Swiss-Prot record:
Cellular location(s): Membrane
Sequence ranges assigned to domain SEA in this UniProt record: 57-175
Keyword Disulfide bond belongs to the record: yes
EC category name: hydrolase
Listed GO biological process terms: establishment of skin barrier; proteolysis
Ranges of the Cytoplasmic topological domain: 1-32
Active site: 248, 293, 389
Annotated TM spans: 33-53
Organism annotation: Homo sapiens
Segments on the Extracellular side according to the record's topology features: 54-438
Name the UniProt record assigns to this protein: Transmembrane protease serine 11F
InterPro entries for this protein: Pept_S1A_HAT/DESC1, Peptidase_S1_PA, Peptidase_S1_PA_chymotrypsin, Peptidase_S1A, SEA_dom, SEA_dom_sf, Trypsin_dom, TRYPSIN_HIS
EC number(s) stated in the UniProt entry for this protein: 3.4.21.-
Amino acid sequence: MMYAPVEFSEAEFSRAEYQRKQQFWDSVRLALFTLAIVAIIGIAIGIVTHFVVEDDKSFYYLASFKVTNIKYKENYGIRSSREFIERSHQIERMMSRIFRHSSVGGRFIKSHVIKLSPDEQGVDILIVLIFRYPSTDSAEQIKKKIEKALYQSLKTKQLSLTINKPSFRLTPIDSKKMRNLLNSRCGIRMTSSNMPLPASSSTQRIVQGRETAMEGEWPWQASLQLIGSGHQCGASLISNTWLLTAAHCFWKNKDPTQWIATFGATITPPAVKRNVRKIILHENYHRETNENDIALVQLSTGVEFSNIVQRVCLPDSSIKLPPKTSVFVTGFGSIVDDGPIQNTLRQARVETISTDVCNRKDVYDGLITPGMLCAGFMEGKIDACKGDSGGPLVYDNHDIWYIVGIVSWGQSCALPKKPGVYTRVTKYRDWIASKTGM
């Protein structure tokens, strides 16, 4: 039996054609959707694989070598001396030049000179080198890459210092050894490679909401507290037993048994706590004029340096900061005039202001003496405030931090033409040395 062909009316034919096309495009859309899902899964797997495989970590090396075209100077043995600082910076710049434009360029992070020693041929250098490589790489494999890059640079680059190639030694070290070596130097923030500084364009005020500091960001900051009364002043750790602060912090109570010092980014709970053994005020401190507003506090027992607790460098007495130099002030003080003490450490970038400007009649009218330093902004947007007294004003020089000022006085907080006034630390280096031996 033959089947007769099915006949459609014009309307039925249009409907059937529409359904056929709809089924076709549904299939296309399903195929495209499936491909998209597969692609997304593939990309996700690729990203995960990338981060698993390319999970970088820090590798640390202790390098030693001889430099033969310079002579050893006695002050190279004093890490806070201008000679040690300048020579160290020259060596660190040279390391950067050697490695950043080499086969390991993208992997080099930074270097820190640990020691300069005398040698018959010149000067022995001991330096920590820090690199970032995939965690799957071995320290020995990386060592060979570093040595190859160095030797190639010695052949092709004109360097300011002559490295004796046979003397070069490179030893992998772990993070604990690296920290111990860096602890022998002052002014180093262990977390600085992971922690950005407050932006220089920040409009945050030290009063009215200045930026909160992270743990370990300012590891020399201390809180001086009267037992039973809480936080009174800030201070700066300059050795494992000595704090530098302001004399006016003790005008009501100079009894060391009534004071404690704590460290860390919060007052409560503190990371480290110490009793006070001795308080030394400058013999010529004048409360009426704020002259010689400087004091030393000796801890009953020394602190152990760590990522959270470190000492800041004392500047050479010859260091001069030009106007508009960026410096940082930190403390637990009020964020509004006459406001409460803050439990969390805060930070702000300010700029140095010349003594001539600060002594203008419309500013402080001649009250700024050679032992004082002005910092802030003439428009008054950032300033230290109540509770910040005694705390540090610090300056960054090639990732080494120096205390250049001690929060001392000012007219109210953050008023226009009334910047903060700090004790100028460079003027008191001899006094500090006479009391501490530093």
